[in-house]
Amino acid sequence: MLGGSAGRLKMSSSGTLSNYYVDSLIGHEGDEVFAARFGPPGPGAQGRPAGVADGPAATAAEFASCSFAPRSAVFSASWSAVPSQPPAAAAMSGLYHPYVPPPPLAASASEPGRYVRSWMEPLPGFPGGAGGGGGGGGGGPGRGPSPGPSGPANGRHYGIKPETRAAPAPATAASTTSSSSTSLSSSSKRTECSVARESQGSSGPEFSCNSFLQEKAAAATGGTGPGAGIGAATGTGGSSEPSACSDHPIPGCSLKEEEKQHSQPQQQQLDPNNPAANWIHARSTRKKRCPYTKYQTLELEKEFLFNMYLTRDRRYEVARILNLTERQVKIWFQNRRMKMKKMSKEKCPKGD
């Protein structure tokens, strides 16, 4: 060994610079390590004939380019295990949730029925998810999106509100698989329904008084007597939920609803093709009387006492002051003159 290294040093001192000199400096115990780190020697490192690099400048250039000092690795080979829950957060476990790394992609790719969970979806440990408390039984479809591979029980839920929660049961591998498959089908059905609803457009109010509409339909089809509407409304009140329209329990409102339900069957019994039955219930087209207010009546009486007949200009002025039309003022003065004439006849009979 010593003789070989001495021979190599002698060859290098004679001017032949090759990989023998580097080999003697490094040693034989780390050939495999350095070969893996630096790779095989390039074409420039092959042995060159003597006399090519005899000058001191070439020797200095060779030594400057070959700096094989062993360096310490930037990252150590063994990483220290990160604690699942820091000591500061251990005291306040109700406020801070530990970070849970996502599952590896290889595990999700091995199962074709699942997909990679996004960061917005809850982890299976959360009760709202299908693989947690909500889908632990494995029978009912979960409300949340389908989880990925099984994760820890105390995962983040990202503030998603838990929906209908089933009874908690020990989740096994078979139940998790079945619940994930059922949640996949339910989520796909919900997606199809939402897409169909969006394509149809706004077909009506989403939150309507279904119970009230059902009662009206039942009264319209089967109600023949005056109390059919009330029977339909009160008969189902004990078993079903109360109507969403009757949010205000005021006695006046209930009486009005009963009166409406009384009048509805009578109107529905009328035959639209029978004019003999409809003329009794016909509405008059005559305009209703619009009485004047006390202030308007007082001002008109003052004007009548001052002058029984008004000119057109004065009539327009009075109508503008009292917020009336010119026609109303003219008709009132006509009626007032007829009333005065009638009163004068009563006071002075013909015999006198």
Curated annotation (Swiss-Prot):
| InterPro entries in the record | Abd-B_homeobox_TF, HD, HD_metazoa, Homeobox_CS, Homeodomain-like_sf, Hox9_activation_N
Task: Supply the name of the protein.
Answer: Homeobox protein Hox-D9
Q: Which SUPFAM superfamilies match?
A: Homeodomain-like
User: Its family?
Assistant: Belongs to the Abd-B homeobox family.
Q: Which GO terms describe its biological process?
A: adult locomotory behavior; anterior/posterior pattern specification; DNA-templated transcription; embryonic forelimb morphogenesis; embryonic skeletal system morphogenesis; hindlimb morphogenesis; mammary gland development; negative regulation of transcription by RNA polymerase II
Residues bearing the modification Phosphoserine:
146
The organism's place on the tree of life at top rank = Eukaryota
Q: Which SMART domains match?
A: HOX
PROSITE patterns per the UniProt record, alphabetical: HOMEOBOX_1, HOMEOBOX_2
Q: Which Gene3D superfamilies does the entry link to?
A: Homeodomain-like
| One Pfam family, short name | Homeodomain
**Record keyword Phosphoprotein present:** yes
Q: Which residues bind DNA?
A: 285-344
Q: Where is the composition biased (Polar residues)?
A: 197-208
Q: Where is this region: Disordered?
A: 126-208, 229-276
Query: Where does the record place it?
Result: Nucleus
Query: What does this protein's UniProt record list under function?
Result: Sequence-specific transcription factor which is part of a developmental regulatory system that provides cells with specific positional identities on the anterior-posterior axis.
The UniProt entry, under CDD domains, shows:
homeodomain
The annotated regions of Gly residues compositional bias extend over 126-143, 229-238
Ranges of biased composition (kind: Low complexity) = 166-188
Keywords noted in UniProt: Developmental protein, DNA-binding, Homeobox, Nucleus, Phosphoprotein, Transcription, Transcription regulation
Q: Which GO terms describe its molecular function?
A: DNA-binding transcription factor activity; DNA-binding transcription factor activity, RNA polymerase II-specific; DNA-binding transcription repressor activity, RNA polymerase II-specific; RNA polymerase II cis-regulatory region sequence-specific DNA binding; RNA polymerase II transcription regulatory region sequence-specific DNA binding; sequence-specific double-stranded DNA binding
Cellular compartments per GO CC:
chromatin; nucleolus; nucleoplasm; nucleus
